[in-house]
């Protein structure tokens, strides 16, 4: 308390801080040397406290005694170490600006201040007592600690749950892998048995057929030898000059027996395969059918799984001459992912497209707003043929010029054949419709879902074919094609279109604008 009173007596009345280089006026009042000179420059030479004029010609003199006292006060008296004062403020802490004890906390500047700061720099700031500010901060820290502990408890619980789920996934994956391995082992074993049995049956049938062929060959050789001997004997008789001998021996000459028909060999491919051919076809169909394999997602997702090779065009045991002639210009095509509507999902190396209810997201600038997709290849010259398999009716097949609109312009759900720059065939449940320039021609329906498209740019013909159960032309467009043509398709929700490929056929690898000749 005495030290605080002493500091108040040693405070300059102008700056309210401890004297700095103290000087004494003739009236007896003391001030900082710099403070009094600044005061006189602004207010005239007079004492700031008693207003006594300062005589002209007099000089300010430094108060040596007061300066010594200030040095002792600033150094501070030596204190004996006492008990730990606890977590309160350090009583020796002083304001770095004014050298006075820190008594308040300035919330505006976020620091401890002295009494001088409160009447000068922090006069308009929000202030609080040190103990009150400490209580407030302690409450905030305790609340933060409680929230942190709750988060730690929650994180530990989530970590335990995550470990539990990971363990369950590992166990489930092991069980599934074991089950799948067992099923595939049984399937492979059954296939191996069927394979061995089928090969053995074919080998037995081949051995029997070849043995029959050898018997027939031996019979024919014996007959050939008898015929040769008979011919040789006839030539000998013809050279006989004695008429009596000729007549007698010619009567004794016996011709060889009749040859008889060739016995058909007991070999029938259909009989050898039997039900195995149908079984293998159904099995391959189940394995290659989209979504039938174990673990396939119920709905399409954005991931890109490893795809199996695309389907090949079905080759019947006997191909009609018309279709075999069309195959001479066969083209292996792929769908263009950029043009696909946002509800279309491509698979099998872009050979198959499916219309799903779930959207892949917003479409790109080159995608159709309508339920359509086009191929990645286009044609400007030459003769081209391709085949498409539809899962059901309500699909449209066609070709178009590059300027086919991507957006919906009218009431129709597609724009294939609705204008002058496209030609299309709409496959409905009970009929067909050939569309061009907004006009449609109704045609009888077809039962098969395998269709062919033949484009002859030189003659200006676009012909659609039905390939099941037999090959027959459906409709032919005649036009003067003067721009590149791109195959384009429309399909209803739930429908699937597959571009069939032929081994050895031309497979254009260029971009969409590539011109094939």
UniProtKB/Swiss-Prot annotation:
Subunit structure of this chain's protein: Homo-multimerizes. Interacts with ARRDC4.
Cross-link ((Microbial infection) Glycyl lysine isopeptide (Lys-Gly) (interchain with G-Cter in ubiquitin)): 206
Acetylation among keywords: yes
InterPro entries given in the database record: B30.2/SPRY, B30.2/SPRY_sf, Butyrophylin_SPRY, ConA-like_dom_sf, E3_ubiq-ligase_TRIM/RNF, SPRY_dom, TRIM65_SPRY_PRY, Znf_B-box
Family: Belongs to the TRIM/RBCC family.
Record-level Gene Ontology MF annotations: ubiquitin protein ligase activity; zinc ion binding
Protein's name according to its UniProt entry: E3 ubiquitin-protein ligase TRIM65
Any single biological process term in GO: positive regulation of autophagy
Lineage of the species this protein comes from: Eukaryota, Metazoa, Chordata, Craniata, Vertebrata
Coiled-coil annotated spans: 139-227
Function: E3 ubiquitin ligase that plays a role in several processes including innate immnity, autophagy or inflammation. Negatively regulates miRNAs by modulating the ubiquitination and stability of TNRC6A, a protein involved in RNA-mediated gene silencing by both micro-RNAs (miRNAs) and short interfering RNAs. This ubiquitination results in the suppressed expression of miR-138-5p leading to increased autophagy. Upon enteroviral infection, promotes 'Lys-63'-mediated ubiquitination activation of IFIH1/MDA5 leading to innate signaling cascade.
Entry-annotated residues carrying Phosphoserine: 185
Subcellular location per the Swiss-Prot or TrEMBL entry: Cytoplasm
Organism: Homo sapiens
N-acetylalanine sites (modified residues): 2
Gene Ontology CC terms, in alphabetical order: cytoplasm; cytosol; nucleoplasm
Region spans: Disordered: 75-94
